[in-house]
Amino acid sequence: MMRDFPSEDGIMMIGGASAVDIAAEFGTPVYVTDEQRLRENYRNVYNAFARFMDTKIHYACKANTNLAILRVLEQEGSGIDAVSIGEVLTCLKAGFTPDRIMYTGVNVSDKELKQVAETGVMINLDSACEMERLAEIAPCADVSFRITPGVGSGHSAKVTTGNKGAKFGIPLDQVISTYARAKDLGFNIEGIHAHIGSGGQVVEPFMDMMEVLIELVNEIKGLGIDLEFIDMGGGIGVPYKPQEEEMDVGELAMNLTDMIQEETDIDTIVLEPGRYIVCDSTVLLTTVNDIKDTGVKKYVGVDAGFNTLIRPAMYDSYHHVALANKFGKACTDKYDVVGPICESGDYIAHDRVLPDPQVGDLVAVYNAGAYGFSMSSRYNSRPLCAEVMVNEGKAELIREAEDFEDLWRHQIIPERLAR
C-alpha cells in the first residue's frame, strides 16, 4: 500500500515535523525527506535478500543525488550504482570509497572513461566497442558487463530498458565472444549485469531475466572465467496510488536467490534499487497561488510545475496529492493541480478530489523522492527549489533554494555585445 502519513490537528506530519511549519520556515516549493523512512527502506530491501545469500545494495543514485541523502545511505552500508562521472564524483564527495561504486554508463566518451578509470571504481561495460576503448585507457581495470536480457519491464515504455533491441547493454548473441575478448585483453572480470527497467511491480520479469543471466554465467564459466557476482539491476517499484498493491520483495528475494544458488557457483547478488529506497521518503510541498473554474474544469494553481516535478508531464505518472493544512478533511470536488509553467502539459495531478482548496493552502505531493529534484530544471527561468531533511521532528536544510543570480551565473556576454 502507498505510504500513509499521520496528522495533528488537521496538519500533515512528516517525520514528526509539521508540513505547515516546514513550508513557513523554508518556503515552497520544497522537497522534504524523512530520514528514518529512508533508512527503513534501505534496511527492508537489504534484509530481504541478505537472509538468503551475500548481498550488496548499489543504490541507483540517479534517483536522488542529494549529498545528505547519500551520506545517510553511506552510513547504512550501501554501495552505489553511478551512470556518469558526475555521479561518481558526487558519491565520492559524500564519503563513498571507490570500491563501493560501480559505474554503468551508456554511449560514453573516451574522456569520461578515462576520468572514471582514474577514480578506481569498477566499470560495468555497455558494449564491445566501449571495452576496446577502455583497453587502451585502463587495460587492467576491474570490469563487469551489462547485457541485454531480452526482458523488459517498467512503469512506462520510456523506462523499459532490457527488451531486445534496446540501446542498453550487449546483445545476447555477442555476450560470450565479448567475455572471451575481455579475458584476452587482460581485464579483471568480476560480474554480469542486467537491468530490465524502472518501477516494475511484477516478480515474473525479474525471474525471466535471472534465467537468462544464469545460463550466461554457466557458459562464461566454460571460458575459464569464474564470476563473483550477478547484478540484477534495479527496477523494484513502489505503490503510487492509495490502494495499489506493493511488490512482495521477500518473495522476489527468495525466488531469485534460490535460482542463483541452485544453478550456479555465484556467492553474491547485487541489486540496484533507487526508487524503492528514496521514493516514499520524500514529499513535495507546494503552495496554492490561484483557483480557477472554467466551467469545464476546475484548477488549483500551485508554485511547483514540471520544472520542479516532471514525472507527470513526461511519463503521465500518478502522484497522490493532499492538502497538508486540511489533512483528513472531507473532499468536495474534483480539480486539476497545475503549475506556473507556460505550457498546457504542466500539471501535477488530474481530476483529484480535494477539500475546498483556497489560495494559500499547502499541497503535499507524495512519492517525490525518486526522479523528482534530480530531474528538475530552470525552465521558464525559475530557480531550483530547496530540499529539507527531517529527523526526529527536526527539519534541516540540505539544499539551499537558488536565487535569480543563479540563472545567469555561468553565462557570458561577449565584450563586443557589452554596452
Residue ranges, per PLM feature:
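Flexible loop/turn segments at secondary-structure boundaries
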Residues: 65-68, 90, 109, 152-153, ...
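Short beta-strand segments
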Residues: 60, 144-148, 193-195, 231-233, ...
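A charged N-terminal "starter" segment
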Residues: 1-123, 128-141, 165, 182-189, ...
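Charged (often Lys/Glu-rich) extended helix/loop segments that serve as interaction or gating elements
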Residues: 266-419
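Short, glycine- and charge-enriched coil/turn segments that flank and shape catalytic ligand pockets
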Residues: 51-53, 223-224, 243-246, 295-296, ...
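Active-site loop/helix belt of alpha/beta enzymes
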Residues: 137, 149-290, 380-382, 391
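Residues that line or immediately flank small-molecule/substrate-binding pockets and catalytic motifs
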Residues: 105, 128, 196, 234, ...
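Generic beta-structure capping elements
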Residues: 17, 106, 146-150, 195, ...
